[in-house]
Swiss-Prot record:
PANTHER family: 50S/60S RIBOSOMAL PROTEIN L16, LARGE RIBOSOMAL SUBUNIT PROTEIN UL16M. Part of the 50S ribosomal subunit. Pfam families: Ribosomal_L16. Keywords: Chloroplast, Plastid, Ribonucleoprotein, Ribosomal protein. It comes from Hordeum vulgare (Barley). This is Large ribosomal subunit protein uL16c. It is found in: Plastid, Chloroplast. GO terms for molecular function: rRNA binding; structural constituent of ribosome. GO terms for cellular component: chloroplast; mitochondrial large ribosomal subunit.
Length: 137
């Protein structure tokens, strides 16, 4: 799984703020079941990968998983015990900015009980409250 963009226009970004709710990526598009965020947060590439692995491991064979978020924001950190000044720190890891309503993972090709269990395991690895939703036909 990709954990960061191949290339970006700029190495460092402002932190920004997470106002409002997500209007993009808030509907199920690919699978039948999904994990939806209920709180705003930065989700790191490692957390995304841990959730993906948990779902894959639980679902075993059968079923398909779609990861609907991508870590495209670099987070900079200063070295420890460094004095203030002398510019911004270097990029250390990547995060996905997630607002309430955003779909994190989607799943299809499995029964609802399997999907619910797999997604609940992935939800426990996320730093935010989230809910299981299913496609209403």
């Amino acid at each position: 799984m990709l954990s960061n963009p191949k290339r970006t226009r700029f190495r460092k970004q402002h932190r920004g703020r997470m106002k409002g709710k997500s209007f993009r990526g808030n509907r199920i598009c690919f699978g039948r079941y999904a994990l939806q965020a209920l709180e705003p947060a930065w989700i790191t590439a490692r957390q995304i990968e841990a959730g993906r692995r948990a779902i894959t491991r639980y679902a075993r064979r059968g079923g398909k998983i779609w990861v609907r978020i991508f870590p495209d924001k670099p987070v900079t950190l200063r070295p420890t015990e460094t004095r203030m000044g002398s510019g911004k720190g270097s990029p250390e890891y990547w995060v996905a900015v997630v607002k309430p309503g955003r779909i994190l993972y989607e799943m299809g090709g499995v029964s609802e009980t399997v999907a619910r269990a797999a997604i609940s395991i992935a939800a426990s690895k996320m730093p935010i409250r989230s809910q299981f939703i299913r496609l209403e036909i």
